[in-house]
Structure formats: structure tokens, C-alpha cells
């Protein structure tokens, strides 16, 4: 007999699941052993023994507290039969673990059922990160508006409450959401993620809500884009978000081939009719950093009024208005996206205002918008200072946190970091400036080794010169995989400089492109 059926999910809701002891037995089996708190040098056998004790004693007490709506997860009284220091500290953590995993299992069952929905208006396509650059290079020149921002995860109370509005649209169980909100209010710090090179491991429940929030963020944008184009019925809802969502009109037209026989007519209608009315809206996202490029049509002001302003107010958490001075200062600035700088240059006559009954739409005529081929050296130095590899002026310093590794691991960390940076920015026009980054990483590695062995830099240099000198990465390109190409031959002016094929960015490089 199944524990839960889909009919009971829809009829009774998910709140009664917390009163089933069999459900917590299932949760206990699926719990990750890495989340179990280990105090001191306790043997694993004792830990498993206490785990069984908690299963038989605390589950019934937990269900009883949930029934009384008096669930306090850190104020649990001791049991007289097992009054030990280890057990007292462990059972407080056990309440948190069992509740978090219970919610995680229930929410996973909900979203597994939601994946089978047929009317999900979203196109979510998995692409390599480098496919964004040639796309932007072709599309961004003709676009009028460029919206660049980051998705903020639960930094304010309003955004935290907005998460429960999203959950209520999917679940419709007030008692279940009320219990979830009380638990997350106590553990709100788990839902905030910081992007550094050394990422701390979040609990599985917080990662679930993070992916949920990004999923709803993408679905909101795509829903209004497709609603504006009147192409919602042609979408393929089976696609799922992985790491990089990439949306454009051609991807929508590819789905027409599977369901429509008269493809040329539909493509002509999409290219002529819909483009002339609403223009094109292109959207690229990498993790929490996103960019929207809008090409105007006849009714682009209607889209801006009913969709984009609502999107900015609800999702980004700040008010948006069509102020001339605000938009002029905003679009006159250059900004970084995926580690490259997008340059904006305006004409002298850059605004054309037309009076309309509801508002005064502003039409921008921008010139010279392009992706700069120059590597942002000062931004890279700033990222290295965040990683404590140099100061703000670019002077190398030692990394004390990495001194606990052995010598080979330390040299491999610095070598891989430099190799990834060389590979990512190998097509830049000022790639000779990579010598500054090489100098910082090379001497930071030397100082880290000298700090570990408590010796001078001169003696450390003479000892590890053959192994730490990263100059061979640039000279001997034939020994380093994909950096073995002749850069002068490949990156001529007649060729595109987007010749990278990174399918996934390493953790060591993610710090540079995500902390814009």
C-alpha cells in the first residue's frame, strides 16, 4: 500500500502527512548521513545507536508537538533514561534535521507531480555558457533597452514573503505553509548564499528553494514574452532548468517543427507579424546574473507598461519608473556580464518623447553598443583581492587558508586557477595584460609556500622555481590541452574572438564572472 496517493495529495493537502509515523520512517531512511552532527571523536557505531533511539522516542514527541502547534525545535527537554551530554546535544539537531528532510521530501513529491503539468508556459533550454556571447554580439547592437541585474535571494522580508506566495500558488495548503514559514523564520540564514571561491555547503532544503525561486523567475519572464507574442500554445513544457537558461525567438520556432506541418507559413507570421507588433525580447541568465535585450516594435510601450515594470517591481524588489534622467544615467554606464564588459555609447540626440494618454514612452536610439574585447584587468585584480590573493593595488599576499594543504596541492590550485583564466580570456585583444594576473598568482603561491614552511621567499623560490613558474603555461601551449593553439593565427581581426567551448565553469573561475 502506497504511503501517499495523488488523489489524497489534491483532496486532503499535505499538512496531515506530519501526523503519520510511517512518513518519518521514510524520511529517516532518505536522510543524508553528511547532515548528522558529529561531536568530538564519537565512534560511528554510537552515532547509529543514538539515531535509532531518536527514531523511536522523538518521532512520537515531534508528532504530538505538531498537533498542539507548539513546535519548538531547540527547546527540547531531556529524557531521563538517556541523559548524556552527547545525546542532549544530538537530539536538538535531530529535530531540525527531521523537520527539514520531512519538508524536503514532501516538496519534492509536489514538484514531481507538477512536472507533469501540460500548461506550463516556459521555455528553458540548456546551453553552454559560451553560446551567449555570439548571440549577444549579433543581437545587442540592434536592441534599444538592456536590463541587467541579479536575482536576490531572500535578503529582505518582502522577498522572503514572496516565496510563500509562489508556494501558495502551487500548493494551496495554508496549514502546511504556516508550519513551513515558522521553521524557516528560525533558520533564515541557511537561505542566503554568498558567492566566493570557497563556497560553504548549504542544506538541501535551502538549495531546493533557491532553484525554485530561479525557476519561477525564468517562468515569469518567458510567460510574458510568449504571451506578448501570442505563441504560448506552441511551447514545449518538458524542458527543465539546469544551470543556464537561454531564450530567443529561434528556440521558440524550433518547437513549431514538432507540432505544426505548415512550418514556412508559421515562421513567416512569427517573423513578420509578431516582430512588427512587439519586437524581439532576448533573455540570457547565468546562475543569478541575467540580461534582457529588447528590440522595439510598434507596441513595445505596451509591453513595457504591463509586463516589464511589473516584472522589475515584483522580482527585483525596487520601484521602476520611466524617468528620463534615471534611464539616461542608467544606460550611459558600462557594465560587466559573464566576465566581459558591455559598452554603451549614446548619440547626442538620444531621446525621442511622444505624448500618449497613459504615459510618455521614451524611445532610445543607442549607437555603438557592443561587447568589449578587452579583458577587465582591474576587475580581475579586485576579485583576486576578495579571494585574499592580493591587495586592492595588486600586490601579492599569501593565502593562509590554503597552507594546510601539501605542497603539490597548493601548486595545483594556483596552476589550475591561472589556466582557467588564460583559457577564458584567451581571445581578448589585450591578452598581454594576463601577465599581471600571472605575476600575482605566481608570487602569491610562493608566499603561501613560504608561509607554510616558515622560510624566506628567496629560499622558497630557489626550491620550487621549476614547479611554481607558471610561465610555461603561456610559452608551451602545446603541453596544456586546448591552450595549445596559435593565438595569433586564431584571433585575427577577421575572426570572431568567441572561440571557447566551456560547457561548465569551474568553481575557481566562477568567482570572477559571478561577482560583477
UniProtKB/Swiss-Prot annotation:
Keywords: Chloroplast, mRNA processing, Plastid, RNA-binding, tRNA processing. It is found in: Plastid, Chloroplast. GO terms for biological process: mRNA processing; RNA splicing; tRNA processing. GO terms for cellular component: chloroplast. Pfam families: Intron_maturas2 (PF01348), MatK_N (PF01824). The keyword tRNA processing applies. It comes from the Eukaryota. Belongs to the intron maturase 2 family. MatK subfamily. PANTHER family: MATURASE K. This is Maturase K. It comes from Chara vulgaris.
Amino acid at each position: 500500500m502506497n504511503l501517499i496517493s495523488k488523489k489524497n495529495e489534491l483532496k486532503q493537502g499535505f499538512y496531515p502527512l506530519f501526523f503519520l509515523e510511517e512518513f518519518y520512517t521514510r524520511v529517516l531512511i532518505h536522510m543524508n548521513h553528511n547532515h548528522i552532527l558529529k561531536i568530538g571523536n564519537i565512534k560511528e557505531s554510537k552515532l547509529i545507536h543514538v539515531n535509532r533511539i531518536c527514531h523511536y522516542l522523538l518521532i512520537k514527541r515531534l508528532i504530538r508537538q505538531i498537533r498542539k502547534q507548539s513546535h519548538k525545535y531547540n527547546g527540547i527537554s531531556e529524557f531521563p533514561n538517556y541523559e548524556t551530554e552527547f545525546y542532549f546535544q544530538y537530539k536538538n539537531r535531530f529535530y531540525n534535521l527531521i523537520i527539514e528532510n520531512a519538508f524536503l521530501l514532501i516538496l519534492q513529491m509536489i514538484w514531481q507531480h507538477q512536472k507533469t503539468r501540460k500548461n506550463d508556459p516556459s521555455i528553458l533550454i540548456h546551453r553552454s555558457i559560451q553560446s551567449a556571447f555570439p548571440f549577444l554580439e549579433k543581437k545587442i547592437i540592434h536592441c534599444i533597452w538592456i536590463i541587467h541585474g541579479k536575482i536576490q535571494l531572500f535578503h529582505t522580508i518582502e522577498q522572503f514573503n514572496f516565496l510563500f506566495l509562489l508556494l501558495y500558488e502551487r500548493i494551496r495548503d495554508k496549514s502546511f505553509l504556516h508550519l513551513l514559514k515558522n521553521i524557516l523564520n528560525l533558520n533564515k540564514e541557511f537561505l542566503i548564499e554568498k558567492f566566493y571561491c570557497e563556497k560553504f555547503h548549504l542544506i538541501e532544503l535551502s538549495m531546493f528553494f533557491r532553484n525554485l525561486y530561479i525557476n519561477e523567475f525564468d517562468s515569469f519572464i518567458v510567460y510574458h514574452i510568449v504571451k506578448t507574442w501570442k505563441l504560448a500554445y506552441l511551447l514545449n513544457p518538458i524542458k527543465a532548468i539546469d544551470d543556464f537558461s537561454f531564450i530567443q525567438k529561434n528556440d521558440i520556432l524550433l518547437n513549431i517543427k514538432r507540432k505544426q506541418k505548415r512550418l514556412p507559413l508559421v515562421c513567416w507570421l512569427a517573423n513578420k507579424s509578431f516582430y512588427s507588433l512587439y519586437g524581439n525580447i532576448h533573455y540570457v541568465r547565468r546562475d543569478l546574473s541575467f540580461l534582457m535585450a529588447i528590440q522595439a516594435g510598434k507596441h513595445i510601450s505596451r509591453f513595457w507598461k504591463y509586463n516589464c515594470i511589473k516584472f522589475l517591481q515584483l522580482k527585483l524588489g525596487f520601484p521602476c519608473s520611466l524617468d528620463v534622467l534615471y534611464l539616461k544615467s542608467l544606460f550611459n554606464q558600462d557594465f560587466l556580464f559573464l566576465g566581459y564588459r558591455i559598452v554603451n555609447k549614446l548619440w547626442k540626440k538620444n531621446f525621442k518623447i511622444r505624448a500618449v494618454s497613459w504615459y510618455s514612452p521614451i524611445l532610445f536610439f543607442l549607437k555603438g553598443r557592443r561587447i568589449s574585447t578587452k579583458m577587465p584587468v582591474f576587475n580581475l585584480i579586485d576579485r583576486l583581492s576578495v579571494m585574499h590573493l592580493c591587495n586592492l593595488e595588486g600586490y601579492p599576499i599569501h593565502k593562509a587558508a590554503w597552507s594546510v594543504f601539501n605542497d603539490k596541492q597548493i601548486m595545483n590550485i594556483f596552476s589550475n586557477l591561472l589556466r582557467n583564466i588564460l583559457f577564458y580570456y584567451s581571445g581578448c585583444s589585450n591578452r598581454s595584460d594576463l601577465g599581471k594576473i600571472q605575476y600575482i598568482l605566481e608570487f602569491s603561491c610562493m608566499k603561501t609556500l613560504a608561509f607554510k614552511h616558515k622560510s624566506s621567499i628567496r629560499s622558497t623560490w630557489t626550491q620550487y622555481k621549476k614547479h611554481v613558474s607558471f610561465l610555461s603555461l603561456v610559452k608551451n601551449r602545446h603541453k596544456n590541452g586546448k591552450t595549445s593553439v596559435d593565438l595569433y593565427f586564431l584571433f585575427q581581426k577577421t575572426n570572431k574572438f568567441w572561440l571557447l567551448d566551456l560547457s561548465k565553469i569551474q568553481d575557481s573561475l566562477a568567482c570572477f564572472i559571478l561577482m560583477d
